[in-house]
Every structure is written in structure tokens, then in C-alpha cells.
Amino acid sequence: MTPRQRRLGMLLAALACAGIALALVLNAFRSNLVFFFSPSQVAAHEAPASRSFRLGGLVAPGSIRREGDGMTVRFIVTDKAREVPVVYRGLLPDLFREGKGVVARGTLDRSGTFVASEVLAKHDENYMPPEAADALKQAEQVNRRMASQLAEGERETQR
């Protein structure tokens, strides 16, 4: 083998190793990437059905139900436009309450219930995860638009 062929072989081997390393890093990154979705996005089927994701919003008032085993809790997460039922088995954070912000990590089952593997509550009364705050603002804007359209329709029918 000539020196030129050896250099070319070394270069190709180095490129192959770099490509394999890049593929492994991207695969690890992809498997650890968890997206955030609001209840409205989940209801619109924008959330992945087979992958883990985060669901954020408010715990709907009157929705917390504890099952007989003492560890399983069912509740509803809402963004004031849509609601998603959640089931969680484990200890809830001390700050978990109705009407307060929550972010849960888990998957959707076939019935549309979010099966949470982790539940996080906001840490004080002023904090809301940025994604959840944005989702709530968007839902409130949609609700206002719908209310104004309904009011316009009622005014037109009264004429």
C-alpha cells in the first residue's frame, strides 16, 4: 500500500467512526426528548400516541379522585378550553391541588386517558411553567373569540 492509500484509508475510517458516533448521540438525544402539549393539543390529536410526552395545565376543580389502594389518583388537567383525564399511581407533590398548575409526564392509553409516570406541581402561587402559561393564554383567547362569535350570532338572530 502506498502512503497515499494509507492516508485515504485512515481518513475513511475516521469519517466512519465520526458518523457512527454522531448517529449514537442523535439517537440518545431523540429518546430523551420529551415534548410538552396542552389539553387542547391532546384533544386535537397533536400529541404522539406511542411516545412519552408532558401534559400541562390546571387541575380541574372537583376532579381529584383517590382510589381504594391509596396510591392511585385520577384527576383532570384542563387549559380552560379542553380537558384530559389523568391517572397516576404514586405519591403526589405537596403542592398538588385543584385549580393549580401541574405538569405530568406519561403516555396516552387507547381510551384517551393520560397515564402519568411523574407529576410535578408548581412551587409557589406565582409560578407557572412557561409552556402551561402559554397554553392557557391561547385557550382563553379561543374562548373569547368563540364567545364573541356566539354573541354576534345571537344579535343577528334577534334582528
Swiss-Prot record:
This protein's UniProt keywords: Cell inner membrane, Cell membrane, Cytochrome c-type biogenesis, Heme, Iron, Membrane, Metal-binding, Signal-anchor, Transmembrane, Transmembrane helix
Any single Gene Ontology cellular-component annotation: plasma membrane
A single GO BP: cytochrome complex assembly
UniProt family annotation: Belongs to the CcmE/CycJ family.
Name this polypeptide is given: Cytochrome c-type biogenesis protein CcmE
Record InterPro entries: CcmE, CcmE-like_sf, NA-bd_OB-fold
One GO molecular-function entry: heme binding
Lineage top rank: taxon: Bacteria
Ranges annotated as spanning the membrane: 8-28
Family matches, as Gene3D superfamilies: Nucleic acid-binding proteins
Topological domains, Cytoplasmic: 1-7
Pfam families in UniProt: CcmE
Periplasmic side: 29-159
Stated role: Heme chaperone required for the biogenesis of c-type cytochromes. Transiently binds heme delivered by CcmC and transfers the heme to apo-cytochromes in a process facilitated by CcmF and CcmH.
UniProt entry tagged with the keyword ATP-binding: no
Membrane topology type: Single-pass type II membrane protein
Keyword Ribosomal protein: no
